[in-house]
Each structure stands twice: as structure tokens, then as C-alpha cells.
Amino acid sequence: MKKAILIDGNSLAYRAYFATWKQVEYAKQNNLPFNNAIRTMLLMCWNLIKANVYQYGIVSFDTKAPTFRDQIYEGYKQKRVKTPVELLVQIPLIKQALVYLGFLVCEKDGFEADDLIGSYANLFTKQEITVDIYSSDRDMLQLVNAFTNVFLCIKGTKEMVMYNNENFKSLFYGLAPYQVVEYKGLVGDNSDNLAGIKGIGPIKGIELLQQYGTIDNIYTNFNNLPNQLQKLLNNQKEIAKTFSFLAKIKTDIELDQNIDLTGLKPIQKQALIQLLSENKINTLVEKFSKI
């Protein structure tokens, strides 16, 4: 059976950078190029495609342009710390290095990297191609299905938790993948600045979804709820539905490439070595020279 690897570029680049941030200070002190994220992410991605047999490979990134979510909710992701300049300058080089490694690198104004991953995963699933998604973003868990697995990166790609159709409920509070966005609508998500419904914490949110399944069904059974819960939920349905919508990953956006053009390509060895050499990543120059 054919397999595709889909990587959340921003997520892994952040992990790569902050896992090795001490090297940034060393680079500053010695007037060297910032290269810690390039080196670490390239190693992550290389190890993933060497450890598994994939026929397709995509890494998606966010763009600087506002997304449709920003237009709906001005506060979306407003509390996130700005990306360090020392990482920003490495992103174009990371993208180029990944192309040399054989990946299709993609991005699309108006959408997040998640939406590209969701839409490509949907295309692969329709052709019964197994998909492995790698990210540290729990939003990706909503994409799990019979053909799609999500590897949640805890410490880069060295420590990961695999979510699939069989183990999902045991790992995610007894809920199903489609309920991830329902959970975020009720409980919120601090990382995206989604407040959820005031007074509804994780425990109560899980209980409600285990019993009623969706936000809509909770409100269908509103009169059967205890008085205290009714007070918390009263007139909050549209807020919860909005947050749930914002958390939902698009799976149907128009893509610039069809899946026939997303196959993993042979490594462009000399071009990759030149990029690594120019950015003083000597350990990887040696590594890829031996391939």
C-alpha cells in the first residue's frame, strides 16, 4: 500500500529552533550564521523518510498573509509570541533544503499550513493511500481516520505519540476525532486564543461530549441539563460554534498541485551539500557526502 508523509513545517521548525536555542547565542558570539533550526529540522525530516517507506512527501508552511480565521475573529492567535528573528531568517533556507531533500514544499495565502495538510490528506484518503502526519499541534488530531495517522511530536521526532483510528478514543478522553473541534468550542484553546465557554473546563466539556456528542446536540437537550449547567451554557451556543469553526481544519481548499506531483523525489545531493556548506552546517555536509 502506498504511503504519504505530511509535515507541519512551522510546527517542526519551531521545535527544531527551541530545542537547540543555545546554539543561537554561540552563533551571535562568534559571528556565525544562524543555522540551528535548518540543521535540526533537516535531520528530523531525513530520519523520518529513512525510517519509513513513503511514496509521497509534503511539507506545508504558513504565510505572512492574514487567513480567513483572522477575518472572522480578530483575536485569533493574538496571544502568541512573535517568531524570533533568528528563526525567521532560517525559514527560507529550511524550505529550500527540504526541496533538495525531495519534498514538495507548499503554502497558500489566506490559509494555514494545517488546511493544506488537511486538504492533501483528504485527497490521499480518497485514493486509499495511507497518510502519516507529523506535527506538535493537537488540532491535527481531528484528521485521524481509517487511512490517516497523526504523530504528535513531544520532543522533536525522537519522542512522539501516534494517534490512529484504533487507539484514538483511549488517548483522547474517550472521544472521536470529529469531536476535537467540539471540545475546543466548549473548552477553548489558549494557544489559538479561543476562550471557549466561561465555566466549562476540560472535565465538564468531556462529560458533555461523551454524553451528547456535539455542541448542537448539547443545546438540543438543553432543558434536560442541570440548572447550573444551563446557566453556564445559556446564550453561549453561537460563541461555542464560532470557536469550533475556527478550530476546524479545512479539507477542501483548492490545491496548487495534484497528488501525482507530490511524490518524494530523489535527493539533490550536490545542491543540498552546497546549501549546507554555505551556512556552515559542516556535520551535515559530512553526513550527506557519504550518501
From Swiss-Prot:
Q: Which Gene3D superfamilies match?
A: 5' to 3' exonuclease, C-terminal subdomain, 5'-nuclease
Q: Which UniProt keywords apply?
A: DNA-binding, Exonuclease, Hydrolase, Nuclease
Q: What does this protein do?
A: 5'-3' exonuclease acting preferentially on double-stranded DNA.
Q: What is the lineage of its organism?
A: Bacteria, Bacillati, Mycoplasmatota, Mycoplasmoidales, Mycoplasmoidaceae
Pfam families reported for this sequence: 5_3_exonuc, 5_3_exonuc_N
PANTHER family documented for this protein: 5'-3' EXONUCLEASE FAMILY PROTEIN, FLAP ENDONUCLEASE XNI
EC number annotated for this UniProt entry:
3.1.11.-
Record keyword ATP-binding present: no
Q: What is this protein called?
A: 5'-3' exonuclease
Q: Which organism is it from?
A: Mycoplasma genitalium (strain ATCC 33530 / DSM 19775 / NCTC 10195 / G37)
Q: Which domain of life is it from?
A: Bacteria
Q: Does the keyword Nuclease apply?
A: yes
Q: Name one GO molecular function term.
A: DNA binding
From the UniProt record, give one GO term of the biological process aspect: DNA replication, Okazaki fragment processing
Q: Which ranges carry the 5'-3' exonuclease domain?
A: 176-269
